[in-house]
């Protein structure tokens, strides 16, 4: 039997298998008249995928679901398929980029797009985090593509098919030219791929989104219509106030943003903005004025101090790349600027360079929304400062001051988040 793909004709996850089939010379038939919400709810479909998601591929040996698994199956249907590379390391790199495409590109495009389409709840802070994470991912992809035409090797592989299909949704639905122009190598790569004959057979002519979709507002529920009653003559009563019926504008007004949990903490004697002003305005006698002022202000009940150490210092072999890495981290921390102060040090005169930091956060722990939204956090070891330990307290002071040498080594760079 031929391979049969169950999905809508415009489904970008189905495109992966269809493009792989074009390159591989494998026949895959797309079912006709597939209707999302109907076709995928039938008993026959649910036998193939019990949770009703698409796409699903029918094969002689049984069904396969999950789009990357389907694309792999189609690719492996042809022996020695060049879409899987020519060596073990190329195969590993193809799978590496497939994972990156799913978790770093597709996921973040979805987190930005779906709430705007009304498919998921819209939360402004979450959108900002999704855009920041997507920019980080596209930045990494852009760097790789600066010196590579394809993701792996010197011809199209399955990695390019999966990446292009995931980028397709972003370019077509939400990533405008003003957004993608920051990543010129990604742009060049995407337009090169979608204009390859085997891609174009499936995708057709691709046009870039001209604007970001507006946030979809939920339509107010239809008002109940009461059955008409025969008119009765009755003495006129004084007009009653209308019951709880808001004017149109009020119904459509956006709901107030939910408060950040940190705003609900008990008041602290430490006013973070006052400390930031003191830090910025102290030009001389820094230890006597700013450092002393910090410890006078510090409230261990309302704030916590944390050391961070980069886990992969062996990778820090190029000075400007290391400094850019730290700068990118600080940009992504922007969502907590109201609640944090930080110092990041790049240490050493020769590579590999060490990256260490000190952070002051509102509350007794690192805020959960920071851990959830700033992906760099997991690249560091975090240790809570014990201010009863004089050595740790002095280390805090030295890091705030940019004291050099620091722990016996020179400072290549020091950055402040305030």
Swiss-Prot record:
It comes from Oryza sativa subsp. japonica (Rice). It comes from the Eukaryota. InterPro entries: EF-1-gamma_plant, EF1B_G_C, EF1B_G_C_sf, Glutathione-S-Trfase_C-like, Glutathione-S-Trfase_C_sf, Glutathione_S-Trfase, Glutathione_S-Trfase_N, GST_C. Probably plays a role in anchoring the complex to other cellular components. Disulfide bonds: none annotated. The lineage of its organism: Eukaryota, Viridiplantae, Streptophyta, Embryophyta, Tracheophyta. PANTHER family: ELONGATION FACTOR 1-GAMMA 1-RELATED, ELONGATION FACTOR 1-GAMMA 3. Residues 1-82 form the GST N-terminal domain. One of its GO terms (molecular function) is glutathione transferase activity. CDD domains: GST_C_EF1Bgamma_like, GST_N_EF1Bgamma. It holds the Pfam family EF1G. Keywords: Elongation factor, Protein biosynthesis. Residues 210-265 are annotated as: Disordered. This is Elongation factor 1-gamma 2. Residues 87-215 form the GST C-terminal domain.
């Amino acid at each position: 039997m031929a391979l049969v793909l169950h999905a809508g004709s415009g489904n970008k996850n189905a495109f992966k298998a269809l493009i792989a089939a074009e390159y591989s010379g494998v026949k895959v038939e797309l079912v006709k008249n597939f209707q999302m919400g109907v076709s995928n709810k039938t008993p026959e479909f649910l036998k193939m995928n019990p949770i009703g998601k698409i796409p699903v591929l029918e094969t002689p040996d049984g069904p396969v679901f999950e789009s990357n698994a389907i694309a792999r199956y189609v690719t492996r249907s042809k022996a020695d398929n060049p879409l899987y590379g020519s060596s073990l390391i190329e195969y590993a790199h193809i799978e590496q980029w497939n994972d990156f495409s799913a978790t770093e590109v597709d996921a973040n495009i979805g987190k930005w797009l779906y709430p705007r389409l009304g498919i998921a709840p819209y939360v402004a802070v979450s959108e900002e985090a999704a855009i920041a994470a997507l920019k980080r991912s596209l930045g990494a992809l852009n760097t790789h593509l600066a010196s590579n035409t394809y993701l792996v090797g010197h011809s199209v592989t399955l990695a390019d098919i999966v990446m292009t299909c995931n980028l397709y949704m972003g370019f077509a639905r939400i990533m405008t030219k003003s957004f993608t122009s920051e990543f010129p190598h990604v742009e060049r790569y995407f337009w090169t791929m979608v204009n390859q004959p085997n891609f174009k057979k499936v995708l057709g002519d691709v046009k870039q989104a001209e604007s970001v979709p507006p946030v979809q507002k939920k339509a107010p529920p239809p008002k109940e219509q009461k059955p008409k009653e025969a008119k009765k003559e009755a003495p006129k009563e004084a007009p009653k106030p209308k019951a709880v019926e808001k004017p149109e504008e009020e119904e459509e007004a956006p709901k107030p943003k939910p408060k950040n949990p940190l705003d609900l903490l008990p008041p602290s004697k430490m006013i973070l903005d006052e400390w930031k002003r003191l830090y910025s305005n102290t030009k001389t006698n820094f230890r006597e004025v700013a450092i002393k002022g910090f410890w006078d202000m510090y409230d261990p009940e309302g704030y916590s101090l944390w050391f961070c150490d980069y886990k992969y210092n062996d990778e820090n072999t190029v000075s400007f790349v290391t400094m850019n890495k730290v700068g990118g981290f600080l940009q992504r921390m922007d969502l907590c600027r109201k609640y944090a102060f930080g110092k990041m040090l790049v240490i050493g005169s020769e590579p590999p360079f060490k990256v260490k930091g000190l952070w002051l956060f509102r509350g007794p722990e690192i805020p959960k929304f920071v851990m959830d939204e700033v992906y760099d956090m997991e690249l560091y070891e975090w240790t809570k400062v014990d201010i009863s330990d004089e050595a740790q307290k002095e280390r805090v002071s030295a890091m705030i001051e940019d004291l050099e040498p620091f722990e016996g080594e020179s400072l290549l760079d020091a950055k402040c988040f305030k």
